[in-house]
Curated annotation (Swiss-Prot):
A Pfam family assignment: NusB
An annotated Gene Ontology molecular function: RNA binding
Organism: Buchnera aphidicola subsp. Acyrthosiphon pisum (strain Tuc7)
GO cellular component, one term: cytosol
Record keywords: RNA-binding, Transcription, Transcription antitermination, Transcription regulation
Protein's UniProt keywords contain Nucleotide-binding: no
Taxonomic classification: Bacteria, Pseudomonadati, Pseudomonadota, Gammaproteobacteria, Enterobacterales
Family note: Belongs to the NusB family.
Name of this chain's protein: Transcription antitermination protein NusB
């Protein structure tokens, strides 16, 4: 599957997570409704569902992973920024097959598309700090 399909899956997941957080509707119903309105042709649907189900199922743990790297409380974050960070931290924590640099870059790109003017800088700062302190940036040498 093309990387652009996965990028679109992240963007769609972000929109559904945003809607879910505001409306408190059932996440699966929100996803089905959202996808009815979208052209699903170039979206990695399997990854889209993995993100929304995985993030909503493990939301408290993901939020706890983020907290040490934030300058303010989770509740003070905008809904978009919180959803972007949840996607990025989910990938960092659960998807070892995705390079950490990809997760950071995708989070930044989502922030540029959907966030406020300086959201991408905030997302970049949080993710850079997390990757460094969590040790994802260390190279593994196999001898």
């Amino acid at each position: 599957m093309k990387p652009s399909f996965r990028r679109k899956a992240r963007a769609c997941a972000l929109q559904v997570l945003y809607s879910w957080e505001i409306s408190h509707n059932n996440i699966k119903e929100s996803a089905i409704y959202f996808l009815k309105e979208k052209n699903k042709k170039n979206i990695d649907i399997v990854y889209f569902y993995e993100l929304i189900i995985g993030i909503t199922y493990d939301c408290k743990n993901i939020d706890n992973l983020m907290k040490p790297y934030l300058f303010r409380s989770l509740k003070e974050l905008g809904h978009i920024e919180r959803a972007i960070l949840r996607i990025s931290f989910y990938e960092l924590h659960k998807r070892n097959d995705i390079p950490y640099k990809v997760s950071i870059n995708e989070g930044i790109e989502l922030a540029k598309l959907f966030g406020s003017e300086d959201s991408h800088k905030f997302i970049n700062g949080v993710l850079d700090k997390a990757v460094f302190k969590m040790g994802y940036n260390k190279k593994v040498v196999i001898t």
